[in-house]
Amino acid sequence: VLAGITREFDDKCMDVFLALDLPRAHYILGKLSGFMLAALLTAIIVSLPLWWMAEPGAALQWTLALALELAVVAAFALFCAAAFAQFAPAAVLTLAFYGLARGLAGLQLMSAHPVSGAGSWQQEISRALVDALAWVMPALHRWPHTAWLAGEAPAWMAFAMDALQGLVYVALIATAAMIDFHRREF
């Protein structure tokens, strides 16, 4: 995602796209659609061995959850690549986003139960900041669950809520990318 978009900026292919009589949003939506399709195909290919070992419902749920996770990260990578137009800052921010979204549950646990300084105002502020961050970041640590593959019955309603959350994040990130790309002067 990052290398392809930054290469288009560096090779001046973007000038050719912008010369066409198409809205800039079509470029972002087209790229996002392609990246989401690639995320789905990647999730299917990666999960093929699971279909022989796990229950079919659990394998399907795990595959779809992985595809949603990859779609959220691909949308954020597209946003970063379009915003920065350089590989290094976009890659660092995308990796930081993914690491934070994956590790936020651990940060919440550590801030709620500190080793020392429990009850201090610094600990309360750090816990409040981590909790506030958890409200705006996608909960990638919740999907896909390994327990689904080990015999735990998949809860389709909980998965539907996680899928809705993933689709909302993809839509929000795509909207931010379109707004940023529209305001940019080439």
PLM-predicted stretches and their roles:
Residues 178-186:
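Membrane-interface capping segments at transmembrane-helix boundaries
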Residues 8, 40-44, 74-75, 103, ...:
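Short helix-kink/termination motifs in transmembrane helices of multi-pass secondary transporters
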Residues 96-179:
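Terminal transmembrane helical anchor/hairpin motif
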Residues 1-18, 32:
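Transmembrane helix boundary and interhelical loop/hinge segments in multi-pass membrane proteins
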Residues 1-4, 28-90, 109, 156:
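Secretory targeting signals
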Residues 24-25:
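Alpha-helix N-cap/start motif
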